[in-house]
Design a protein with these regions (language model features):
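Transmembrane helix-loop-helix hairpins at lipid-water interfaces of multipass membrane proteins
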Residues: 12-15, 34, 40-94, 101, ...
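Transmembrane helices of ABC transporter permease
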Residues: 35, 39-52, 154-209, 281-294
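An intracellular "coupling" helix at the cytosolic face of ABC transporter transmembrane type-1 domains
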Residues: 30, 34, 38, 126-127, ...
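Cytoplasmic coupling helices
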Residues: 100-119, 133, 157-161, 184-226, ...
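Short intracellular "coupling" helices and adjacent cytoplasmic loop segments at the cytosolic face
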Residues: 9-19, 107, 115-139, 143-145, ...
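Juxtamembrane helix-loop junctions of ABC transporter transmembrane domains
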Residues: 2, 12-22, 45-46, 53-62, ...
Length: 632
């Protein structure tokens, strides 16, 4: 009883999700299919030939009954029987070619869509990723694309072949007996009219199911990584997490049951309609045969043709529902493709000059605020899709110059804008006002890939892919030899550690490098930076999480890494920047002090307070979390 009530609840559940599919979505799908026009034409030719062949066997059946069996002609019966077999073999061969053609077009279109989606997403600004649920995004790139793929690959052939089959079958029926054919057509509106409404309903269910699946994927993505799993264990909440996941999975189950029951009820209704139509044809046609108006062979042929008519009509109606479900997938994919990218290459972007980059950096009256949600994200991929206003100004009137080979240190309290300032150099964000130049070139006029090739960054928590040590190092220079790796690791004071690993450079470091210590990860990141050989280096709290021993080793490695390069160093431990060519003190997004260590220490300002706190062994300024927002 409880199960029955549950099913009734599932059946009656109403989605509040919009259920219409826009013309723009359909137009864009056809746009992706445009490169395959020649293959589509060939596919249509094969489908047409196969559909025309489909009416041959019923006509042969008429001849077998009227011209062979009724006449007692065994030779004619044998020939006609062989022709039926030949027609079936030809149809089978054409069906194989038809399937190959539809799969080629469908899979090719999805390949193009998947690559375009991946390329677009990875070029989106960091602000997109800070707002987006990773699980929902992965679901969009994976599940939704697969949903579109299945529908297109299977439905493309179904729609075209069944449409042509229905048309040729109906024409043949009229040629055989127009009165019976008119009766067969009476039920056609009952196949066609409900399809639009049913399609909308199923599309709404499909869209809701995809959203629920994305929510479930987000939960798994956040919990099934080292940091998430560790947090759950340390707080002793596996039971609560399982309960929460069960609730999400239960909603996915309910929507799946609803979809299955609704779809099955529709198929049953179509089957009953087809059976009713076939019965009408046999009843009326049988009466005509009894009266001598048509032959028994014609009646048998029409019975087969009617079955061939209602079958494709039912499949076409179902295909319409499948197509609308597929367009839901496309709609969700296009939503990501339309995600705004405020940090794109300018249409008139120029390549970097051929001569070597000197590393002269200048900030000209730079101001910055973080973009609002509608400027840099997709609402349906956020946990809270409530629109917000543009962020407050976090950097205001910054004027700085860093000469080639010089070190600029940026210090200040947490939230003062240190990491934000550094993130503007590789254009993880663009300035709101003012400009930044590298060797006299406005960063916004340069191609991003060329700009970033000249900038190296080491953060307090460097990212390592779940891959080998060698693969992580070669991410900076894919063509690097083992000798190049040795040289970089030696300079980064990590070569001895690598050689002690079980498989050397082939040792897998684990997700985010969790199999390495913090100091080892930092030194691998420095080795990777040395392989990149940038003109400008940014160190964002690179030693803030290390103990004294590891910090000393990393500082030696950093000294080699910074030699001859322009450097911006964001420091929590002021002892690491006492030798900087210039120290800039930020507070609430503004430069409040600047100078060398001795000058600032003796000036009695904010820097002196931070230095005094360091001397006393107190915590002065909290460290940021890498390049990105500094917090409120």
């Amino acid at each position: 009883m409880a199960n029955a009530m549950h099913l009734l609840h599932v059946m009656s559940y109403q989605s509040d999700t919009p259920q219409t599919i826009g013309r723009d979505t359909r137009r864009r799908v056809w746009g992706f299919a445009r490169p395959y026009r020649s293959k589509v034409v060939g596919f249509l030719a094969v489908v047409t030939a196969s559909s025309l062949l489909g009416v041959v066997p019923p006509l042969l059946f008429r001849e077998i009954i009227d011209g062979a069996i009724m006449a007692g002609d065994r030779d004619r019966l044998t020939v006609l029987g062989l022709l039926v077999v030949a027609a079936a073999l030809a149809q089978a061969a054409l069906a194989f070619v038809e399937r190959w053609a539809s799969a080629t077009v469908g899979e090719g279109l999805i390949f193009d869509l998947r690559v375009a989606l991946f390329d677009h997403v990875q070029r989106l600004p960091i602000s997109f990723f800070t707002r987006t649920q990773t699980g929902a995004l992965v679901s969009r790139l994976n599940n939704d694309v697969i949903g579109a793929q299945r529908a297109l690959t299977g439905t493309l052939g179904t729609v075209v072949s069944n449409a042509i089959t229905a048309a040729t079958t109906l024409l043949t029926l009229f040629l055989l007996e127009w009165r019976v054919s008119l009766l067969a057509m009476v039920l056609l509106p009952l196949f066609i009219l409900p399809a639009r409404r049913v399609g909308r309903t199923v599309a709404g269910i499909t869209r809701e199911g995809m959203n629920l699946n994305a929510s479930m994927n987000t939960t798994m993505t956040e919990r099934f990584n080292v940091s998430g799993a560790q947090l759950v264990k340390l707080f002793g909440r596996p039971s609560e997490e399982t309960d929460g996941f069960a609730r999400r999975a239960g909603r996915v189950r309910d929507i799946g049951i609803r979809n299955a029951l609704f779809s099955r009820a529709f198929v049953i209704a179509l089957t009953l309609l087809g059976a009713t139509g076939t019965a009408i044809v046999y009843w009326v046609g049988g009466s005509l045969a009894i009266s001598g108006s048509i032959t028994i062979g014609t009646l048998a042929s029409m019975g087969v043709l009617v079955a061939q008519l209602y079958g494709p009509l039912a499949q076409l109606t179902n295909a319409r529902v499948d197509v609308m479900s597929a367009f839901v997938s496309f709609e969700r994919v296009f939503e990501v493709l339309d995600a705004p990218n405020p940090v794109a290459d300018s249409p008139d972007a120029q390549p970097m000059p051929a001569e070597a980059t000197t590393g002269h950096l200048a900030f000209h009256n730079v101001s910055f605020r973080y973009p609002a949600a509608d400027e840099a994200s997709v609402a349906s991929l956020e946990t809270d899709a409530t629109p917000d206003e543009p962020g407050r100004i976090v950097l205001d009137g910054i004027d700085l110059t860093v000469g080639p080979g010089q070190m600029l240190a940026i210090v200040g309290p947490s939230g003062s804008g240190k990491s934000t300032l550094a993130s503007l150099v590789p254009r993880l964000y663009d300035v709101t006002d003012g400009s930044i130049t590298l060797d006299g070139h406005d960063l916004r006029t340069l191609f991003q890939e060329e700009l970033r090739a000249r900038i190296g960054v080491v953060t307090q928590d460097p990212h390592l892919f779940h891959d080998t040590v060698g693969a992580n190092l070669r991410y900076a220079r894919p063509e690097a030899t083992d000798a190049d790796l040795d040289e970089a690791c030696r300079a980064a004071r990590i070569l001895d550690v690598v050689r002690r690993l079980p498989d050397g450079y082939e040792t897998v470091v684990g997700e985010r490098g969790h199999r390495m210590s913090g100091g080892e990860k930092q030194r691998l990141a420095i080795a990777r930076l040395l392989l990149k050989d940038p003109a400008v280096v940014i160190l964002d709290e690179a030693t803030s999480h290390l103990d004294t021993e590891n910090e000393a080793i990393v500082q030696l490695a950093l000294a080699d890494a910074l030699a001859g390069r322009t450097a911006i160093v964001i420091a929590h431990r002021l002892s690491t920047v006492v030798d900087a060519d210039e120290i800039v003190v930020l507070d609430e997004g503004k430069i409040v002090e600047r100078g060398r260590h001795g000058e600032l220490r003796d000036a009695g300002g904010l820097y002196a307070e931070l230095w005094e706190a360091l001397v006393r062994g107190e915590t002065g300024a909290e460290s940021g979390a890498g390049i990105g927002p500094d917090g409120p």
